[in-house]
Amino acid sequence: MKRIIAFSLLLTFVLAAFAQRLPQRTMPPKRELRSAWVSTVWGIDWPKQGAPAERQKAELVRMLDSLKNNNFNAINLQVRSMSDAFYQSSYEPWSSYLTGTRGKHPGYDPLAFAVSECHKRGMEIHAWINPYRFCITKMWNTERDQEAKRHLLRWGKFYILDPAQQWTIDRIVNVCREVVTKYDVDGILYDDYFYPNGIASSVAAPDYKEWKNSGTDLSIGDWRRENVNRMVKAVYDMIKREKPWVRFGISPAGVACTSQSLADKYGIDPCPSGSDWQYNGIFSDPVSWLKGHLIDFIAPQVYWKIGFKRADFSLVAPWWCKTARKFSRQAFVSMCIDKLMTTSEFPEWAAEMEILRRNCAKDQGGTIFWSVRNLYNKPGLSEQLCHYLKRTVYQYPSLMPLTPWRNNVARKAPVVNFLKQEGNQLTWQLIPRCRYTVYAFPKTVDKAQFSTEVKYLLGMVYNPERGGEMVTYTIPAHLRATYQFAVCPLDRYGNEYAPSFTE
């Protein structure tokens, strides 16, 4: 008995000490990005290369069901990894990661299917694009590759589209325009691949003559960073013209701007932990994109734990939140769960998310998990992780953060008409170019107060693809008898309008 008591006291002490280490939990915000990377390059996450189309579709559906059931609200689907396409492209060949053969039609349009399936579940889909990468070691040689091969920059085994060439900028703009205009994506996102890491800046550099002949007064490093910035600006401007509600962001390496002189240039504090290898390694300057308002959000890959000496999450992540706030932009921090091995790691990620919620502007933050396979594809452990996140930090659904700098289009406030409950179904009249939020709240709750409580939010609904006059929503069984329901119009910018109620 004494041993049991002693063990119980020890366990209580350990748990109390651990609890003191974690930030006190906050109420989940009503608006927060909750996303995951879906990597298609090398078959990292999806699909199984060469599998039949129906099997690939079924796997994506299983993935999305898991995310939706655990209150995620978006995915980042990689649709261009090696100057290829996971969609019907006018410019580039079908990806080999679909069928095993570059240029071979997979029998369906994966991006169109993914957009449809995400929106059926009230989830956003952000098209993840690698802007420059062409290939590694092996040279692609389809008919559509021939033009690109005349505009390559090589360093070691890496081939990329030459960032200095106007042809490259035009190609990337055209690719992004095609994705934005042909597909109902909610966002465009780049990762952290720009110039090849470690590319020389001396006379041995493959673009040394190009820089010399450009007539610029910039150093070769500044010239390279400006080449990247010109491309980023061109894509941002195109999206604003074509579909101004579509978000555009970049996910750079996790540490930037550790130099005091560079921080002074931007009027910010230097990043307090880690080493900025990207500025002179891949010639990426993320703070310039924030300061220049060339992006809507930054999604830094802060893939280190709290207390890690070389780059402490508790120092680096708040710095990104603060820097994004200074320039009136959003920080959606990318967190790594790639080394998921045991349940003992779960509290670390909950603690990291609490740090983000306390440091990002209210309703302006979010998280992207690297990567999705750890959330649904590790037998037993993935399910436990999702249940843990839902129980501790994702207790309720959430909406996407607003982007007020894009949200300047005046429109007459939409109204939900003919809202009815019939058995387990809500129906209402479709409003063109709108989405909807659905709420369920006890009949004792004041109708003027329900929308301020995130716990009453059931989720978001898109208009049906096939049109028609009515929208339908299935009510969860446990809410049908004692709850009343409200539906609010939600425009493509995320503005929520006055509710309509069931009788």
Predicted features, each with a name:
Residues 31, 39-58, 126-182, 281:
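Active-site-adjacent "subsite" loops/lids of carbohydrate-active enzymes
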Residues 58-84, 182-183, 288, 294-298:
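Catalytic domains of carbohydrate-active enzymes, especially glycoside hydrolases
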Residues 70-106, 204, 297:
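Aromatic-lined carbohydrate-binding/catalytic grooves of carbohydrate-active enzymes
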Residues 80, 121, 149-294, 303-304:
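Polysaccharide-binding and catalytic clefts of secreted carbohydrate-active enzymes
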Residues 283-309, 320, 324-406:
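Substrate-binding cleft of secreted/luminal carbohydrate-active enzymes
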Residues 391-433, 494-503:
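Pro/Thr/Ser/Gly-rich low-complexity, intrinsically disordered linker/stalk tracts
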Residues 437-480:
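Recognizes extended acidic, P/S/T-rich segments that occur
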Residues 475-497:
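Beta-strand-rich modules
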